[in-house]
């Protein structure tokens, strides 16, 4: 919602002198509005944010709403303040747009404060560093790419490899076990996905500890560019004012960069490499640096990052990598093989994967798993050309272990139960480590690889095998009885 600040300000009106798409030039004869000031067109709901002062009388702004109906000569009013976001306990379990308007058909907001979305990150003296693992219940992440409580993790992948599904599953697993507040920020994604997520969270009963805010792909670039700042303003309130831990989920950070690129082009800035805005680094930093820990609380952020054409050297991906404590890379090759979640264990990394933080046993197991998978990756070309039989005995055993590990790291998700008909599984870190240890010890060498596919804890292999044998015996017994008759 658009709110005037509490202080009284003299009315200040301007006139539209130029409209080019979402970019609007406005002349003010009396007082020139400062950068980030919000302007409103008189008589029509169009909101403009000032991004530049062209000269002593004209400002250039970007529209945060569609500009249909806007024309030269229209009067524009200075709102007297910047874009604001609602904060307070009343925003919990609600869904908002970039202006702080509720979009869930619920009652009007009461007892909320309105704070500017343009806030400075915590100073170095205010920051706090912690080394604590954030368990997700997803085997491959908890074992090989452990997340940091109060850290930033990125889910990198091209189109259709499972970023949103993985993010939704992490929401399901973590929101129900997370003691703090969870905030979901949808930037430039499909409206359908936002509606589905809201319904799923409501049915799962986790909305009482959740806030959702959306700037979807049908909205102007200005709205998509600012919705991340609005979400962070809400997160900072719970961290600083209520001393609570916050889980901030962003889908998709690339769309934030893309919106900035659109704005940069509309503003007439010279593009840099691959057409991105020259200010991409500073714009991304202004968002990412606000995601920080203080003595009062922590903001843990998990961000989906679309990678254009699967090119991980793309400037958007490279700039995002540098801000993260954990990078989870999704592989199209693994997705095509049906190995879901399609996380590439060799490309993914985490700064938490050190013996001093996760312990000697976990660290040594993770390293042994990586070595096994890396060696198998090296042998794939030989296997493709000459066949598995041409390998020596030790290499054949290693390949068997690696393939069983790959299948053990698959996992049925709660968020896909309605599509896959497989019941979702939440696996503890101890069960995941125990499974890796036993597979590396060749305990399941006599079991088919498929027995480890889409299971939870590794003990399910033996349980399922016994059930399969019992079913087979029953069928044989029934067939025998039929033959006698």
Swiss-Prot record:
One of its GO terms (molecular function) is proton-transporting ATP synthase activity, rotational mechanism. ATP binds at residues 157-164. Its main location: membrane. Its EC number is 7.1.2.2. It is found in: Cell inner membrane. Belongs to the ATPase alpha/beta chains family. This is ATP synthase subunit beta 1. It comes from Psychromonas ingrahamii (strain DSM 17664 / CCUG 51855 / 37). The gene is atpD1.
